[in-house]
């Protein structure tokens, strides 16, 4: 990504300078101070991007003085399981300063990372393996990338011990021992001249050794890559551009060895030994759109076993020449764009973590640009992007190459403001359609004549003869180049003859230029002695490493046995799932863990039954007492109910008696009332007939009686007597 060079470290914005001048004029003798609030640029990237797009010249910034850090040189010894130990040294960056506190654990972890064969031939382990010649910082970077890709974890001081334990758990128990005559088994690396075996002593005492020395002198100089962080930017970007055009051998193989090897294991390649297209086993990744037709972008037959798999088949015998996993850009690009803004991991990040070379079609590039989600799709450090999946299609049409290169330079927000016309021309030009139509006419040409463009032995000239002179008639240009390509089958034979002639010339020169071959005999004998001594030391070192590995295995076994003995005799009823995870963390064998958990389950069941029986026995007495009390209370309740029924009967009898008495009393009262009425009537008749004076009724004087006036006058008139 291009860097913004609008301001240097001491540059002052124009508006700020004008404001300072005006303040000096208004207040002489005083030093002007900026009233613009300081902004931390590391946390204001969106503000800076917006200011650049709008062409603003006034951007507040803050100058931070970074203190100097005294970094010491640290040396570590890495002991791979399948080769000899080697030392790496260098300084540790301040961001990884916490590693100084755990150097022994770091050496232990690096031993596993330097032994990719311990992880069941994982491609990720091979890609991030630590090799001799690396600097310490490059080895730490490889270790961090290994942890991120294999364990999906981030290296921190808090979880460093957990990471080391997890790496040991993943590593296979079988450790391969390096033999004296180790050979590289990867036929692809040997085929493409990318073998980087360790240095070996060459005996030049005979003609065979001299021929071998001459062969080594004629080969290109190859050195180990110092790591991505130390690659010259021009070399790195040149290599990415070559991969983009399907020209991996044109990149500097000192840095892109692994990527080139993966490329020729994925994409269609012509095998000169078998005389046909190689049968590829490794699968690649294609980012494409849902509506494009992939069959129109290759000269091979296209077979789709399922919705996510694409096979390229040879047109002669239908064997598989390339395998790809198809991923639709519409499904992953929007989510990846949102994940970048939120700082999360996307599906596309997981796909990129498992490969080094990917393919993206021209239509997919245009789709991400059109929808504004192109950031982080092609500009990745850990993958090399190839436009298209058929090398011949990309080499002949160049569809999408310019657009992909533009997206590798800047983010889309910057391109929309600074390179809008260029972006418009790449999105709306009709040249891609014309080249695509011309390529369809190529499919009708001879299939055998096109095989030379998939021949890896053409080295840097791979694909260069296509369209050397571009004419207005694209179809005629393709036909001319196809006619010329039919003469390229003799090139490998001629190159082999040239190499043999060079070997003969060098051998003759070495023999003729040696005036005193006898003088070299002592040196050669000394060289042979040193070689035998080195071989003996290597064998002793190998035996020592084997004994050391056996001792470490015995120690681990003893620790495991002691722990197993304790766990077997320890009585516990804890059968929680977390307990099984803790036993797994201390590396207890799965069968032992299963036996322990089953035993705990049985003990827990026994204790539950025992506690149930004791509780039942203790509660039985109380239950009996309560039962007896319940019986007594039931009897009392029965007696009370009988008494209540008896009382109810008595009450009913009393009520009946009272009712009868009331009736009797009522009758008697009615009789008395009637009798009273009768007597009253009789009294009235007698009163009318007899006049009774008060003096006759009482001997008491009338005056001495109170309320005499209220008394009834019973006097009877005398005339009625």
Curated annotation (Swiss-Prot):
Keyword RNA-binding: yes
Region (Interaction with mu-2): 14-40
Any one Gene Ontology cellular component term annotated for this protein: host cell cytoplasm
Main location: host cell
Compartments (UniProt record): Host cytoplasm
Region annotated Interaction with sigma-NS, chain positions: 1-13
GO molecular function ontology, one term from the record: RNA binding
UniProt PTM comment: The N-terminus is blocked.
Positions in coiled-coil regions: 522-559, 628-684
Keyword terms, alphabetized: Coiled coil, Host cytoplasm, RNA-binding
Site feature: Important for the formation of viral factories: 570, 572
Residue segments, region RNA-binding: 1-38
Location of region: Involved in the formation of factory-like inclusions: 471-721
Free-text domain note: The C-terminus is involved in the formation of factory-like inclusions.
Entry similarity comment: Belongs to the orthoreovirus mu-NS protein family.
Function in brief: Non-structural protein implicated with protein sigma-NS in forming the matrix of viral factories, which are large inclusions in the host cytoplasm where replication intermediates are assembled and viral RNA replication takes place. Together with mu-2, recruits the other core proteins to these factories. Binds RNA and recruits viral mRNAs to sites of viral replication.
Assembly, per entry: Interacts with mu-2. Interacts with sigma-NS; in viral factories. Interacts with the inner capsid proteins lambda-1 and sigma-2, and outer capsid protein lambda-2; in viral factories.
UniProt-recorded name of the protein: Protein mu-NS
Organism from which the protein derives: Reovirus type 3 (strain Dearing) (T3D)
Record lineage: Viruses, Riboviria, Orthornavirae, Duplornaviricota, Resentoviricetes
